[in-house]
Amino acid sequence: MKKLIYYFGSNGSDGNASMKDILGNKGAGLAEMSNLKLPIPDGFTITTELCNYFYTHDNSFPKNFRNELRTAVEKLEATTGKVFGSTKNPLLLSVRSGSIVSMPGMMDTILNLGMNDEVCAALGEVCKDKRFALDSYKRFLEMYGATVLSIPSDLFEQIYERHKIQADIYRDSDVTPQLLEKIIEDFKKLHVKYAEKLITDPYEQLESAIKAVLNSWMSNRAVIYRKINNISESSGTAINIQSMVFGNLSKTSATGVIFTRSPSTGEKKLFGEFLINAQGEDIVSGTRTPLPIISDDSNSMKATMPKVFDELSKISETLEKHYLDMQDIEFTIENSKLYILQTRTAKRTAIAAIKIAVQMVEEKLISKEQALMRIDPESLNQLLHTRIDYSKGLTSIADGLPASPGAATGIIVFSPYDAEKLSHHHKVILVRHDTSPEDINGMHVSSGILTIRGGMTSHAAVVARGMGKPCVCGTNNLVIDEKKQTLIAGDLILKQDDIITIDGGTGKVFLGAVPLIQPTFSEESKLILEWADETSKLKIRTNAETVSDALVSVKFGAKGIGLCRSEHMFFDKNKIPLVREMIIAPDIDRRKLAVQKLLPLQTQDFKALFRVMGDKPVNIRLLDPPLHEFLPTTEEDKKNLASSLNLPLSMINQRLHAMHEVNPMLGHRGCRLGICSPEIYQMQVEAIFTAIFELHKEENIECKLELMIPLISNVNEIKKLKGDIYEMIHELEERYEHKFSFSLGTMIELPRAALNSKKIAEEVDYFSFGTNDLTQTTYGISRDDIASFLPYYLEERIFESDPFTTLDEEGVGELIEIAIKRGKSSNPSLKLGACGEHAGHPASIEFFHKMNLDYVSCSPYRIPIARIAAAQAKIKHG
């Protein structure tokens, strides 16, 4: 068995920052801080190897682990001068998880471990403070009971509140030692009820706490968090055991969290909060509203503890320069002595991540490439957050702390269960006293989070920022009535389903929906996206067929349109009746008449699109979906169609019945329509080239057209349609006395097309991989029906991910690779693109980069994400 325990502390460390895989993120940080000679409590890290052993050996420990653990504690006793379980100078321990990737609040922590009646009495004597010792004992029983014995936390809360009410006490600080003794006795009875005995042996407590932390790796909340954030389950967690230092020892003791820069905005200034006479869990849990470290407030740390503040400031600067990244630092002050408990790379909003990355390049701390690799592409969704339009003279109903930026409007829900249930049909705002890790699913589906308690570093704030969701915390002027399920704001009483709006950028809460402003990119955002474009090889295009989508795409930096689904233009209310006439018409003459009515409308559509895109390439896919999608379904629409064609309703119903297909997505669609009903493609080609000619003549715009034929499976299909298209273009060139320049391509979206790509490539200028249909036809799974079994497949690990979100590299990816290799063998100048939903997914973009595609085309609001992902792929793979 490999080494399981690594020491750290005032005498140096066995490990360092590079050992995250075995020490976890927290343990590696503690080891590195020891090597930097920073003031940290002595301790040791149990490696991730134990977690992996635990889960592969029926939740048991290795043979010699208990002896190693006892040796480690004895070494800790020697360095601290305290003894574990002693009734003279007791050593108390903290037991904390430490996964490789930070998972704030998702796993378990136990403080003050080693407590029993005798140790509590000894601690009171040593510290000359009986109340402090009793308070520490109470905290231990509550935390150990909830974490190790699975006693519901609210049972402890009920006991505590009952005793306070009976004693006519309202503030925690007024609870007397005598009352604490009564509370502790009731807590101990609760332990006996659930565990059949009170566990008083310190080593038994320690072993059971270690098992509890290991078990929390597979807790429901941790599993959900890993799924949401794509964190591997196989990495396991380390465990960090440290000698306790007490932030709740006196009025010169405190606990807090400090960020070396603002996690919300990225501003270069220290930002954080602390609580006097408190332990670390008090600030992280959000049960008390903390004080600022820096502010004009006389209660700030800078004002009340200036010497400690200066030391903390210097350590913060040291850690940021050492790690070359913004740090999230937890600390405790015990009788004016500062201890650093943890440092880690700080979670931050996308706005902050970009600002910090750019700042650090300007400060010559990191390179542009390093800056780009620091950005989570998916987090750029946050740049698209709306904000409230305050020019409308709005009045808020409450004010809190701006914990995570962005504005959200939704109905009030008071539980994560209701959030999950109602989010299918409504946008919801989750309203809680404070959030806990158990709320993770409800937070994930909510549009925004509002908490009554907690600060900028509470669980709600940290998790919301990581999710990119608006969050307001510490709204002390709001009251939740749990029994009546109402939210009280002064004289206003709100119930579930009432609508509110929260502003996570200002901390304000409004009644109802309020006017919102769409976001704009900061100068730093524009700059880092420019760096991305300079770095990447893949060009990023967009899927667009409307002027509004095209304008948004150009604004977000699209280099062209990679997929214009021409059929989407047909659904306009002015066109759909003509499309239906074209499809249902009983003879060719009537069909051609309907087509001619559509022609000028299609021409104007294409003209408007080309005008927006200017000299950027525009790839237009000719009509693809089955005709049934355009046909009327309501009786009213059927009657209107019968009237416009001057046909009896019975004949319309006969035609509709005759056109019914059992499996239309694999039926009469795509190129098959163009071959069987050539007048449709002829009309589209005429409209496209007429639009190009008119823009050239009237506005001197030179359009870059790419014309794409869908759903090819046989080279003869492309040959037939290619001949028809070129014949039509030749007629148009003669009519307009103008020579047209364009590229002809096809979508590779069927396995047979991929396998026969050598022949197909001889007939076209480019391939565009339609990964949606290619995935459907490779798997034999309908994208519309996969939801009925996908959750079970993911749970049973049959699928690692949704194949319609993350490209299947083994199956679909191999078909793409075959198509590229064979296509290039017959046409070396063949251009390559991809235009399915996968084209906006970072992992899939990395695959497309490795396949040497020329571009990917994604939805407009995925463009910034794709630009960063393409740059990262180039940095990783060259």
Curated annotation (Swiss-Prot):
Keyword line: ATP-binding, Kinase, Magnesium, Metal-binding, Nucleotide-binding, Phosphoprotein, Transferase
NCBIfam families in UniProt: PRK05878.1 (NF004531), pyru_phos_dikin (TIGR01828)
Residue ranges crossing the lipid bilayer per the database entry: none
UniProt PTM: Phosphorylation of Thr-457 in the dark inactivates the enzyme. Dephosphorylation upon light stimulation reactivates the enzyme.
Ranges where the record places region Linker 2: 503-537
Summary of activators and inhibitors of this protein: Activated by light-induced dephosphorylation. Inhibited by dark-induced phosphorylation. Both reactions are catalyzed by PDRP1.
Modified residues (Phosphothreonine): 457
Binding site for Mg(2+): 749, 773
Central: annotated span: 405-502
Name recorded for this polypeptide: Pyruvate, phosphate dikinase
Free-text note on domains in this protein's UniProt record: The N-terminal domain contains the ATP/Pi active site, the central domain the pyrophosphate/phosphate carrier histidine, and the C-terminal domain the pyruvate active site.
Role description: Catalyzes the reversible phosphorylation of pyruvate and phosphate.
Cofactor names: Mg(2+)
GO MF terms, alphabetically ordered: ATP binding; kinase activity; metal ion binding; pyruvate, phosphate dikinase activity
Key word Cell membrane present: no
Assembly and interaction partners: Homodimer.
Organism listed in the record: Rickettsia bellii (strain RML369-C)
